[in-house]
A protein has these predicted regions:
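Charged/polar low-complexity intrinsically disordered segments
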Residues: 3, 9, 26, 36, ...
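Helix-turn-helix
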Residues: 73-104, 108
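Alpha-helical structural segments
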Residues: 65-72, 104-126, 137, 141-142
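Short, positively charged and aromatic/hydrophobic N-terminal segments
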Residues: 12-13, 39
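Basic, helix-initiating cap at the start of DNA-binding domains
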Residues: 32, 38-77
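C-terminal peripheral helix-coil segments that are non-catalytic and often amphipathic
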Residues: 32, 36-50, 179, 183, ...
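Helical hydrophobic small-molecule/effector-binding pocket
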Residues: 132-157, 162-171
Length: 275
């Protein structure tokens, strides 16, 4: 193992690849691995597909076990309190081969959670709504979820902070923003909306991180967020007021509780655990 420790964690793959088994590229001088597997000083050709295939095929059972345990614990006790390796009964090297760090698990969770959350939010909203209203419903529900459950608040804040998870959020949200608000600013490109999402995501994160109190009620928080975000996307002022009135007329807490229940159920099915 002393030889392996000189390399990055990606070298600790079983069964090992050999230079002959990898198509193309020269082998690492210190181990019988293709140079592509070594990220710690080897300067041969880089074929990242070899690394990804090796990790996936060798580690699927461990990956499933890690996700099952960790997603459950994230929901039950929060992101920060969860000790991944100890709870999932895998070695540190196996965990690092698959996820590198705890934020890798978070990224897997976020990708599934966001897609299901928004799909559920749309169905809960009921009638066919104009796109700007759908955006308001989705963001209002997300913000309300963080007021209903402190562990969800922590997950969302970390998701908007950690690079891998936040990159996914920014990228996917920007696509949705372009579809929803592109007609309000037809001169803007998809890339422009990505840059705008960086700002609106910062506003979202700040509001999620600040719990409601007697002065900053949930209703006030939603009104402030929607006013700023919709104005930034050039939604006309009279339409903004109608959207805010629509959200104000919803029982947003009850709707969000239903979304949270459906989200937890979907997560339990996807990652095979019970809460």
């Amino acid at each position: 193992m002393s030889q392996i420790s000189e390399h990055s964690e990606f070298c600790n793959i079983s069964p090992p690849l050999t230079a002959q088994s990898a198509a193309g590229g020269q082998g690492c001088e210190r181990l019988a691995f293709p140079a592509e597997v070594c990220y710690n000083g080897c300067k041969k050709n880089v074929r990242r597909d070899v690394v990804l295939i090796a990790i996936t095929n060798a580690s699927l059972p461990s990956k499933k076990r890690i996700l099952t345990v960790c997603v459950k614990l994230f929901l039950e006790q929060g992101y920060k309190k969860t000790t991944v390796v100890q709870q999932s009964s895998v070695s540190n090297s196996i965990f690092q081969n698959i996820f590198r760090a705890k934020d890798g698990v978070l990224a897997e969770l976020v990708e599934f959670m966001f897609s299901n959350q928004f799909a559920t939010a749309r169905s809960m909203a009921g009638a066919q709504l104009p796109p700007a209203y759908v955006y308001a419903v989705e963001t209002a529900i997300q913000m309300t979820l963080t007021e209903l459950n402190e562990n969800l608040r922590e997950i969302y804040i970390e998701a908007y902070t950690q690079k891998e998870a936040s990159d996914y959020i920014f990228r996917e949200t920007a696509k949705e923003l372009y579809q929803i608000f592109g007609s309000y600013q037809p001169e803007l490109t998809a890339q422009d909306f990505f840059f705008m999402e960086l700002g609106s995501a910062g506003i979202m994160r700040a509001y999620m991180a600040h719990p409601c109190d007697e002065e900053l009620t949930l209703e006030k928080k939603l009104q402030m967020f929607l006013t700023m975000s919709l104005r930034s996307y050039h939604v006309p002022e009279d339409e903004i007021q109608k959207i805010i009135a629509f959200i104000g007329g919803m029982d947003i807490r009850t709707v969000s509780e239903r979304v949270m229940h459906e989200l937890f159920k979907a997560l339990a099915m996807r990652f095979e655990f019970t809460l």
